[in-house]
Amino acid sequence: DLGGQNSLGVVYTDRMHGDWANRVFALDGNLIANDTYSIRAQTGFSSTTDIDGIAPMWNASANVSTRKWSGGVNTSGYHADFDPAVGFLSRGNQVTIGASAVRTFYGKEGAFLERSSFSVRLTGAWEYQGFFDGDDPEDIRFYPTFNFQMRGGWNLNIFTWIETFGYPGNFFTHYYLKTDTGFEPYKGVPNLFNIGPMISLSTPQ
């Protein structure tokens, strides 16, 4: 504990089974300034008996929040061999970078439209080694959102997702399709594009 809402921590896990062992070491910290700025970061690595060397990871974000503007940036990365044997990792072998911004407008006292906001979020995801090789991102996600808060407790939210997903060939290395003449490797498609809106209206409580 560094005082206030600031902290610094250490994580160490150890799992062994016979001659096999998995160890994870990480540092994490949290810093908040003036209730406006915040930085959170974690970095570490895993070491596993049947894998040469260590496998690094990181997860970090920086955010700012004011009455009219807020936003942030975040990044995470997990080496293909990173293995938290006593924990859970939703998806490894990936690097993600994201950024978001929100602009809030306030109506005059007694106005029908009390508050409105517009936000955008952009995220890119790479295969871990591809990121360091300078490859294009496999997945790109862009999310613009409009929100309107009206007098009396009515709320209108308009969310749109615009996404493109690349083909992760390593996921299908051993996946084959049966044909009339035998089996063929699954090839997939280069990219899948997805777009859609979601509109929600909340009535007064």
Can you describe what each PLM-predicted range is?
Residues 42-205:
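Exposed, low-structure sequence patches enriched in small/polar residues
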Residues 1-48, 110, 115-122, 200-205:
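Surface-exposed extracellular loop regions of Gram-negative outer-membrane beta-barrel proteins
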